[in-house]
Structures are given as structure tokens and as C-alpha cells.
């Protein structure tokens, strides 16, 4: 069965994709009758060398994304994973020659079809008296024994686009550019790894990988790599890649060693998330620096893809200062990243954390009866939430991402860890403030933020008094802050429903002669009833608000958790009173 693709037709997808890119970029034009994109300011290139590249489609943004001042003059696109037609290549050469350029350099990836078709077009152009040269890029570092076809052309080709473009922009001649980039290309190595295959529109995937497997050294068309291995953490993957790329017994290795200076490219092969790319980039830089390699520049993104392949390639290019200047030279090519002209290695990547405001000594005093009671309450709350983890997760799966219990359990374990550090502060306001900071840092998600808001606001009325009216006022203040920023209201099927119900009962604490436990008992029962009632509500806030009410037939997990917290508090205070 072929994979799903968003195309108009299999036959027309390459042309449609190129047309869409040109339509969105006024600096580009299509060459009438051909699948060719060119700079729209060709006339400004009179007397300068033109640079043409291309190949099969399906590797976007390569190569059209790298057309622009300081990079390519134009590209010729073949069908998906197919070499461009000789006629299209020749038409592109003629177009730039007729614009008055001082010769054309063809930058070609090392694949048989590309070499043949670009080579034939070059010979025909030369026969017409046009000055044309060709460089073939072979940067694949996968194969330890050189094959007759040579090394494949991979993402390192993009760096040659950049270097050649900068040289052409300086006004260097065709012969000299050709010689320089031919030498530079020999100091580039690329290696890929993937978790999945890719599939040409209208066809089945190019190969199969088990769920726990990945393939090392595969090509950008799904060609076989050097071996399959079990899925391991990113640090191990990157270590394996760097070891393979720099192993001197590997005929296709890149000669990077301690003391070398490199440009690093972390290239998404199509289907990785930016989250994964960031993790891989972090590992690559750490591990290179750990080997004594200076990372002069780092590029992270999608440069040469393989359709939807869930993989990454790493490219290393040995550089010196003159070569870095060419990498840093200005370009307006849409797919080239805007990089700082500063070395990655040697830069201080950590800024000192801001200092905490000084606390009044009386606010931080610990120990005493109140402190011990607060410790018992917090310990019971923590134990309760940890015990409810699976139940809350199950409730959350119907309307959220199924992690409400895990989130509350994470908060509970953080509180337990804090309690082990020593006695809690004697001041309830200080306890709530510290809990707020702890939950914001450790709990995470919207729940952490909402509890953080609630506790921060609730702490304020308790700074002056800690009697029952002050605790009722603290509840009111916390709810007000939660509503202000969370945008939830009673009846929206959130934790606020339980908290609001409890708060209404706690208003009785503001009356003269009010008792602690009778009022709190009513508050707990109201909170539990409100939590149970949420299963009949339509969600008005949070992720559940995007779910049909017909699917919401269980209580809201946040409301259940809030009610359980009140029940835990009551149980501790009842035990103390007994």
C-alpha cells in the first residue's frame, strides 16, 4: 500500500512544488517550459560566474531554497528522486549564458543519473561555445570500502553552494572557483541515520525497519546503509556517527581530530521534530567539543531532506578563517539560516540565574507546633496524590493527554523531597510561597502554573494573620488569581469547580465563633460533590474544552485531585483533634 501524500497528482507533484516555492519568493522565476527556477535578477550577474545545481525532487529545500545572491543562480528539478532531463539542464545553462554571465559552474551530487545528464548538457553547451565546468560532490562517509560508483553526494553539497556562491559574488573566475571548491569538497563528510523509510508519492516505502531499529549510513533516496542497529539514546547514536565518520580506517572518513575546526550541519531528513533536532544538536556539539574539536559554526534545520524520512544527517567540514569568511558571507537564499559570525565553541552559553530577594528572618524561622502540623498535612497530601496517579491518568485520557495523575504525582514527590530537607517554615504564608515556587519548577504544565498562582495569591492574606478569617480570605485570593489568569469559571469542568465549592463553605470561617472542623468538613463534602458533578458538565476551559461533551462521561481529574487534597487536610486535622 502506498503512503499518503498531499499532492494534486503523482506526475505533477515536482512541478507543483517548484511553482509554489517560486510563487512565494519574488526573487525567483520559473524558466518557461522547463522545471527550472532562476534568480529574477539575472541581468545583474553580467560578468560574474553563474552557479547551477539540482537533482531529483523530494529533497526540499534543496536545491531551490538555496537560490539567491551569494549562493545559487538557479536549479533544475527532476521528478521525485529522478535526475533532471538533459534538455532542462541545457536550457538553464543557455538562460544564464544569454544573461551575460562569465561562465557557469554546475554543482552536482554524485549519482549516476545526475553525472550523466549534467555532464551531457555541459558537453552540448561547450559545443555551442558556452563556458561551463562541473564539480561532483561526494561527501558520504558511510562506506568503509570505496565502491566503483564513489561516495554519494549528500548534505555537504549545500556548503559547496555557499562557498562557491561567496566566491562568485567576489568576482572570482570560473576556473579558479572550480579548483577551490574541488579542494574544499574533499574536506567534507556526511553520515545519516534514520528511524523510518521514505516513500515516493504513489509507491510503497523504500524499505522496512522494525519499531526498535534504525539504519546507519543510508542514502537520501532510501538506499541501504552500512548496518542496522537497535534504537539507543541520542548520545549513543551521535557517538556512533562521529566515530564512524572520523575513523581513519574508513576510506571515506573526514579527517577531523583534536584541534580541528569544523562547521557542523545537523540536517533533518524530513520527519524529525525540532525537539529531536535540538537534542541531536546538543549531543553533537558536546561530543565534538569533548574530543577537542572546535565547532566554529553550527547549522541546525532541514537543508536536504528525503521526503518524510524520520532521520538526521551530520555534516562536518574542516575550516580555517578564510573559509569561514565564505560561510559567513551574506546571502538572501531563503533556506540558508541567519547565523551569528561567532564561534560556537568558546562562547559562554550559560547566564547566571537571577538572585533571589532576601527574606525577612522571622519569615523563614522553622520548627514549632505549626511547622510540625504543616509537615503532617503536606505529607498526607503527597501520599494521597501519589496513590491517585493511575486513577487520575485514566480520567484524563478521555479529555486530555492522560498525564494529570503523573503531573500531580510529580508535584507530590517534589513536596516529599522538600520536607526531607528540614522543618517547614513556621509562617503559613512562607510555606505557601515556597510551595508555589516548588510546584512552578517541578510540577510543570498548566496545573503547575495554576497551583502556583493560587498559592502565591493565597499567601498574601496570611502574612498579617493566620486565624480562620485569614484562611478564608486566602482561599478567596487564590481563586481570584486562578480565575484572572486561567480564564476558567465555576461550571467549566476544571479543578476550579471543587475549589470554588469548598471556598463557599469556608466563608463561614469569617463569622464570629466559627469552628475549624465542622466548617472544613462541609467544605470537603462540597468539593467532592462538585468534583463528581463535573462529569455532567461541558468543558469551558482547558484541553477538555476541545472535546465533544458526549465523550466526557467521567469526572474532571483536576477537580478530583483538588477535592482529594481537601480530604487529606481534613483527615490530618481530625486525627490531631481526636
From Swiss-Prot:
Its EC number is 2.7.1.28, 2.7.1.29, 4.6.1.15. The active site is at 221 (tele-hemiaminal-histidine intermediate). It catalyses: dihydroxyacetone + ATP = dihydroxyacetone phosphate + ADP + H(+); D-glyceraldehyde + ATP = D-glyceraldehyde 3-phosphate + ADP + H(+); FAD = riboflavin cyclic-4',5'-phosphate + AMP + H(+). One of its GO terms (biological process) is carbohydrate phosphorylation. Residues 372-571 form the DhaL domain. InterPro entries: DhaK_ATP, DhaK_dom, DhaL_dom, DhaL_dom_sf, Dihydroxyacetone_Kinase. The modification Phosphoserine is found at residues 511, 545. Residues 9-336 form the DhaK domain. Homodimer. Interacts with IFIH1 (via the CARD domains), the interaction is inhibited by viral infection. Belongs to the dihydroxyacetone kinase (DAK) family. Catalyzes both the phosphorylation of dihydroxyacetone and of glyceraldehyde, and the splitting of ribonucleoside diphosphate-X compounds among which FAD is the best substrate. Represses IFIH1-mediated cellular antiviral response. This is Triokinase/FMN cyclase. It comes from Rattus norvegicus (Rat). The gene is Tkfc.
